[in-house]
């Protein structure tokens, strides 16, 4: 049988086994991470939060995430994805559920509701550290380079998908206010944390760490995949403690981290505050859920189509740059517009750019690094980039308290993908990226 037939069969088998399940896991992870944006619509009075306090608490998750990201991903490489990802999911499920009991915890410990909120967000960041880059690293162990943009795109589609579907659900859960003596925002945290605990158990038994362990592949299929990935990895750095350390100081890793910083600032800066922005239009909480879903639905489509376009042309930097430009223009325009309809059109335009950039961006680190160096490098990029997950929400909340408007906060966030665009164009002149296996990462 020709190699092309084996290739199609193997990639299809691996994709169908892992991608839908990992999309579901990330769907739950992202929902648990950002559902606080909807909870804010009714929890502020119960917990005692101003907009600045909420922005700080929403963002402090990422400071904790930053501290443990690289150690967590190195642990994944050592103990295996199956065990480590299951541990991560179980931990974040417990802590996300505990968010529902902030008033009770505060009353029994004597800690204020504000500081209890901060502490739980920090613990959630510690718990979830390593999940996203761990899955990205896991996918590089199973898919040849030519398939990674679309596969990563499918996986990352869980971000807009979770918000597009989760926004109306979150708004509906807020409507359970008073049921069994719980507030609506408490139901929101409990209901959306439970799936993580279930999926943690399933993950432990379902994932396979590496291709040589894949008994569900035929011998011919397994051998082809192992050999193909070995050929690709041979062209990159050998794995050693020194090469892992070098990856953390590689200028390209730093550049990629700064690009991701700009993307994440837009993703979470707008994401955490979008329910509040929409609620400010004077609509009901239920309608807020449906309107909030629109930018994410468009972002979902953009992510899939843009990843396919990038793979079909084998071109990365151009696609990434266009997406970043769209993100900056859309979010920047939303800051200048007061009309609710026009503001939502601009935010939807910006969401397309933000989400379309993500799968393209994540092909770049694996063009540079492999093995444990990839685990460390990907984690470093993700953790440094995710620091803007603190910057975006906090700056918008602080400016909102100071000015009474979201306009200047949105303008500040729009500057981040604009800066990322400049760095991406500069990175495009790095000719080392042209030599990625099979031209899959040609820029």
Label each PLM-derived region with a short phrase:
Residues 314-364:
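C-terminal transmembrane helical hairpin of 12-TM major facilitator-type secondary transporters
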Residues 36-37, 246-304, 358, 362, ...:
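Extracytoplasmic gate region of multi-pass secondary transporters
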Residues 370-405:
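A late C-terminal transmembrane helix in Major Facilitator Superfamily
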Residues 120-157:
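Cytoplasmic helix-loop-helix junction between adjacent transmembrane helices
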Residues 68-80, 302-315:
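Helix-to-loop junctions at the C-terminal end of transmembrane segments
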Residues 67-107:
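Conserved MFS/SLC helix-loop-helix module at the cytosolic interface between two early adjacent transmembrane helices
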Residues 78-89, 311-324:
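Cytoplasmic membrane-interface "Motif A"-like loop-to-helix N-cap segments
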Residues 152-174, 195-196, 382-392:
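Glycine-rich segments within core transmembrane alpha-helices of 12-TM secondary carriers
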């Amino acid at each position: 049988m020709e190699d092309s037939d084996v290739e199609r069969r193997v990639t299809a088998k691996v994709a169908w086994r892992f991608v839908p399940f990992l999309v579901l896991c990330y769907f739950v992870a992202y929902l648990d991470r950002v559902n606080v944006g909807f909870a804010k619509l009714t929890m502020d009075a119960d917990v005692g939060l101003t907009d600045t306090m909420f922005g700080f608490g929403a963002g402090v998750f990422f400071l904790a995430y930053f501290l443990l990201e690289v150690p967590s991903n190195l642990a994944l490489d050592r103990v295996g994805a199956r065990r480590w990802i299951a541990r991560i999911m179980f931990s974040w499920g417990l802590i996300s559920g505990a968010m529902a009991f902030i008033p009770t915890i505060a009353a029994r410990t004597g800690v204020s509701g504000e500081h209890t909120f901060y502490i739980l967000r920090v613990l959630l960041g510690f718990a979830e550290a390593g999940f996203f880059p761990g899955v990205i690293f896991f996918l590089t162990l199973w898919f040849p380079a030519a398939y990674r943009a679309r596969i990563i795109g499918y996986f990352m589609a869980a971000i807009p998908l979770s918000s597009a579907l989760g926004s109306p659900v979150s708004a509906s859960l807020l409507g359970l206010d008073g049921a069994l003596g719980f507030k609506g925002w408490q139901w929101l945290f409990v209901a959306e944390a439970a799936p993580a605990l279930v999926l943690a158990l399933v993950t432990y038994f379902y994932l396979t760490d590496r291709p040589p362990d894949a008994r569900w592949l035929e011998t011919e299929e397994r051998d082809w995949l192992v050999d193909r990935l070995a050929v690709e990895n041979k062209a990159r750095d050998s794995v050693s403690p020194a090469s892992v350390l070098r990856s953390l100081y590689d200028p390209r890793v730093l550049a990629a981290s700064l690009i991701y910083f700009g993307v994440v600032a837009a993703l979470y800066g707008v994401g955490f505050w979008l329910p509040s922005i929409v609620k400010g239009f004077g609509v009901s909480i239920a309608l807020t859920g449906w309107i909030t879903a629109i930018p994410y639905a468009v972002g979902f489509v953009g992510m899939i189509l843009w990843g396919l376009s990038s793979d079909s042309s084998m071109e990365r930097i151009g696609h990434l740059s266009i997406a970043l430009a769209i993100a900056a223009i859309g979010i920047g325009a939303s800051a200048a517009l007061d009309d609710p309809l026009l503001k939502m059109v601009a935010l939807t335009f910006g969401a397309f750019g933000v989400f379309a950039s993500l799968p393209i961006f994540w092909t770049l680190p694996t063009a540079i690094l492999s093995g444990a160096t990839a685990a460390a490098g990907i984690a470093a990029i993700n953790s440094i980039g995710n620091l803007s997950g603190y910057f975006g929400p906090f700056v918008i909340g602080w400016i909102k308290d100071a000015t009474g408007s979201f306009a200047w906060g949105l303008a500040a966030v729009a500057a981040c993908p604009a800066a990322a665009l400049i760095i991406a164009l500069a990175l495009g002149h790095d000719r080392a990226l042209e030599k990625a296996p099979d031209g899959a990462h040609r820029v």
